[in-house]
């Protein structure tokens, strides 16, 4: 599966399976205006695209969801323990009303 970086429409035309609609030349011209020589343009693209893909893989939604769920469960357990520990004042238990401080 091929993943693309999110870009504004004015920055560069839409890419289809790694090939640009209007040709390869246009993207290079846009970056040369910023003061990059043609040799550095390819290195610049490679390093920045690689970096963004690496970050995206590390922080997937599924992984964040799993971590969040795990923390939530452990917090809920702690809250229950604190309520059970104070058996005398069960009616006035404030921990149920309060949200978990970790988030």
From Swiss-Prot:
Comp. bias (Basic residues): 51-103
GO cellular component: nucleosome; nucleus
Start-end of Basic and acidic residues biased regions: 8-17, 39-48
Biased composition (Low complexity): 23-35
KW Acetylation (keyword) present: no
Pfam families: Protamine_P2 (PF00841)
Description of post-translational modifications: Proteolytic processing into mature chains is required for histone eviction during spermatogenesis. Transition proteins (TNP1 and TNP2) are required for processing.
GO annotation terms (biological process): chromosome condensation; nucleus organization; spermatid development; spermatogenesis
Tissues where the protein occurs: Testis.
One GO molecular-function entry: DNA binding
InterPro entries tied to this protein: PRM2
Source domain of life: Eukaryota
Subcellular compartments: Nucleus; Chromosome
Keyword check for Transferase: no
Keywords: Chromosome, Developmental protein, Differentiation, DNA condensation, DNA-binding, Nucleosome core, Nucleus, Phosphoprotein, Spermatogenesis
Function: Protamines substitute for histones in the chromatin of sperm during the haploid phase of spermatogenesis. They compact sperm DNA into a highly condensed, stable and inactive complex.
Family from the record: Belongs to the protamine P2 family.
Subunit structure: Interacts with TDRP.
Protein name: Protamine-2
């Amino acid at each position: 599966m091929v993943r693309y970086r999110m870009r504004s429409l004015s920055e560069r035309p839409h890419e289809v399976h790694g090939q640009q609609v209007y040709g390869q030349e246009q993207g290079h011209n846009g970056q040369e205006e910023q003061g990059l020589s043609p040799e550095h343009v390819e290195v610049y693209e490679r390093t920045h695209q690689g970096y963004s893909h690496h970050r995206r893989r590390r922080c997937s939604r599924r992984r964040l969801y799993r971590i969040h769920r795990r923390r939530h469960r452990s917090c809920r357990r702690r809250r229950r323990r604190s309520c059970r520990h104070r058996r005398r004042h069960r009616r006035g238990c404030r921990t149920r009303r309060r949200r978990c401080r970790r988030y």
